[in-house]
Amino acid sequence: MKRSVTILMTVVLALMLAGCASTAIDTTGGRDGSSFAKAVIVGSVRAEYLYIDRNWKDSKIASQVVTENDGKPYDVVSITTKDGQAKNVYFDISKFYRKKTYADDLE
């Protein structure tokens, strides 16, 4: 019985964490990261790297720069795909850029 409860709690925790990760990346409305207009909305730099890893497995980060477009902050991450193609991926970082970080956010 104790083992069943442990397994159930582990599954519930895993599902909760998976749900949190998916809400940190917003690709609705055709947001594919191909331009400022189609920038992927993210809640953290970690979400940027997760998005890149999910969409361009085994790519390499060439550079990352913070810039503004129409008064809004963006991260532009330059990657080299595994087949050697250079590509820029645009992220809307307005949810967290220059916002106060609390100790609870770091856990």
Language-model segments: what does each one mean?
Residues A21-T23:
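Bacterial signal peptide processing site
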Residues M16-G19:
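C-terminal motif of bacterial Sec signal peptides marking the signal peptidase cleavage site
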